[in-house]
């Protein structure tokens, strides 16, 4: 059930955020992330078409869907090069470099992901009648 929800949500987010990107490789894993203190995370592989998304397997349906949508915004940010990982824990977002001293809630890529996740969840619910 969870795997089907995740796969449907990933396909939906790609169609909403990146409909013309046909060469994305996204590997999704459901893991126990409770000890990490996160619901999920996304990281880039070899290039900006290769991504890994880890999701906490303990999340409920609504939490899981929200987390998938949030992480898929990060995939979109990286695939479009709006956000780039750099060395030493730094990220570039829209041409500006941020380091590890930037608080999580002040990171512009997180602000954007939180702002977009709700609309994606709502549209997914409407399209899939959940």
Please provide the spans of the model-predicted regions.
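Auxiliary, metal-adjacent structural segments of Zn-dependent hydrolase domains
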Residues: 1-46, 61
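Surface-exposed helix-capping loop/turn segments at secondary-structure junctions
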Residues: 17-23, 82-84, 124-130
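Membrane-embedded and juxtamembrane structural elements of multi-pass membrane proteins
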Residues: 34-40, 44-55, 75-83, 87-88
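Short pre-active-site segment immediately N-terminal to the catalytic Zn-binding motif
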Residues: 51-68
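Post-HEXXH active-site segment of zinc metalloproteases
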Residues: 62, 78-111
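Long, well-structured alpha-helical subdomains associated
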Residues: 103-106, 115-130
């Amino acid at each position: 059930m969870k795997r089907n929800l995740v796969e449907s949500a990933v396909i939906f987010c790609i169609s909403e955020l990146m409909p013309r990107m046909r060469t994305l490789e996204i590997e999704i894993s459901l893991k126990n992330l409770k000890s990490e203190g996160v619901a999920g995370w996304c990281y880039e592989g070899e290039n900006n078409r290769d991504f890994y998304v880890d999701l906490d397997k303990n999340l409920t349906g609504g939490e899981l869907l929200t987390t998938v949508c949030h992480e898929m915004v990060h995939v979109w940010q990286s695939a479009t090069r709006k956000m780039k990982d750099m060395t030493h824990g730094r990220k570039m977002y829209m041409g500006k470099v941020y380091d590890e001293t930037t608080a999580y809630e002040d990171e512009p890529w997180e602000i954007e992901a939180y702002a977009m996740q709700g609309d994606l969840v709502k549209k997914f619910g409407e399209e899939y009648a959940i």
